[in-house]
């Protein structure tokens, strides 16, 4: 540091350095201004010690086991850890990566189970709808079969009885192709006769509504999962929609018998939809690979019960009115009523 001082006119210029003391001929005056010129020396960065260091992902470690320090670069004060802690952290990271791989493998196994279950379900549903369409196109003269035979309405209990058997046996229920085709034939024949007695627009509407309800409640099962709050919200929304539908149905100008049929069918469909959501949750979380057929059969029975109930709700009042001889929209009567009058 070099200091240059300037006194008043009586004083002389004096130069001094930091190595030799300053001497002046005049006393220092408080009014004399002092000019300091400081040359800032470049700060020398501390070099690391001569001991060989290792760098592991931004962490500097020392091989000394006793007083080894680890400096981890973070925002704020540096954190000092032992080299053994670094090894532990690396082991934990490796375990975390291994666990994520195991989780991915487990998810892939579940995904394959879902594919098997829903592939079997789609096969069953397509077979039943296809057989019903063949009956509807092949026997057009039997449109009044359900009108003349009220006892056939009891066949809607076939999927309900099958559901009762599957839920009663539980995990002891066999899961093989034989059981699959037994349930498939029993429910497909029932649905085919119901479709044979229905109109084309009623059939198409029932197909679309069944698929829409199945897709909706399967998606809600994935969305709700095991969260009770979500299921409470879903239940509240569904109850509001059901009450709105029943209010509109009861305020309509239909006959009181038709209103009773619509109300009973609406509650039955709600019950089957609840079972469908439960079965979907079982498929998502608790379906082992050796029980894919049984769970697919459960989903199929739920869907067939919903489909037959929709057919009964949409076509039942018409069948009842035709059996009583009520004229249709074009003024014609049914074959049964015309025969009775003649």
From Swiss-Prot:
InterPro entries: Bax_inhibitor_1-related. The keyword Glycoprotein applies. Keywords: Glycoprotein, Late protein, Membrane, Transmembrane, Transmembrane helix. Residues 21-64 are annotated as: Disordered. It comes from the Viruses. The chain crosses the membrane at residues 119-139, 150-170, 177-197, 202-222, 231-251, 266-286, 296-316. One of its GO terms (cellular component) is membrane. Signal peptide: none annotated. Its main location: membrane. Coiled coil: none annotated. It is a multi-pass membrane protein. It is found in: Membrane. Glycans are attached at residues 149, 176, 330. Residues 36-48 have a biased composition (Basic residues). Belongs to the cytomegalovirus US12 family. This is Transmembrane protein HWLF3. The lineage of its organism: Viruses, Duplodnaviria, Heunggongvirae, Peploviricota, Herviviricetes. The gene is US20.
């Amino acid at each position: 540091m070099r200091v240059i001082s300037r006194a008043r006119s009586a004083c002389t210029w004096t130069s001094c350095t930091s190595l030799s003391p300053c001497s002046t001929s005049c006393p220092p005056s408080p009014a004399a201004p002092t000019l300091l010129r400081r040359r800032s020396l470049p700060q020398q960065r501390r070099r690391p010690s001569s001991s060989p260091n290792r760098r592991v992902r931004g962490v500097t470690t020392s091989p000394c086991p006793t007083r080894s320090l680890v400096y981890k670069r973070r925002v704020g004060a540096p954190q000092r850890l032992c080299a053994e802690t670094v090894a532990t952290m690396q082991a934990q990271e490796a375990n975390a990566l291994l666990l994520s791989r195991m989780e991915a493998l487990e998810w892939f196994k579940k995904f394959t189970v879902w594919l098997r279950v829903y592939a079997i379900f789609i096969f069953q549903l397509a077979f039943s709808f296809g057989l019903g369409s063949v009956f509807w196109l092949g026997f057009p003269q039997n449109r009044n079969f359900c009108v003349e035979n009220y006892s056939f309405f009891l066949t809607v209990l076939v999927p309900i009885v099958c559901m009762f058997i599957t839920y009663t046996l539980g995990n002891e229920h066999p899961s093989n192709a034989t059981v699959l085709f037994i349930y498939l034939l029993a429910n497909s024949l029932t649905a085919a006769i119901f479709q044979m007695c229905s109109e084309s627009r009623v059939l198409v509407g029932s197909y679309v509504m069944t698929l829409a309800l199945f897709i909706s409640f399967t998606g809600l099962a994935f969305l709700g999962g095991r969260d009770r709050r979500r299921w409470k919200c879903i239940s509240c929304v569904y109850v509001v929609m059901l009450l709105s539908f029943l209010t509109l149905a009861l305020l309509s100008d239909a006959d009181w018998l038709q209103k009773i049929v619509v109300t009973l069918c609406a509650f039955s469909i709600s019950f089957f939809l609840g079972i469908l959501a439960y079965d979907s949750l079982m498929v998502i979380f608790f379906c082992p690979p050796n029980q894919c057929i049984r769970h697919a059969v459960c989903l199929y029975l739920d869907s067939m019960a919903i489909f037959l109930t929709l057919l009964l709700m949409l076509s039942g009042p018409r069948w009842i009115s035709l059996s009583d001889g009520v004229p249709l929209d074009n003024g014609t009567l049914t074959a049964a009523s015309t025969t009775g009058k003649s």
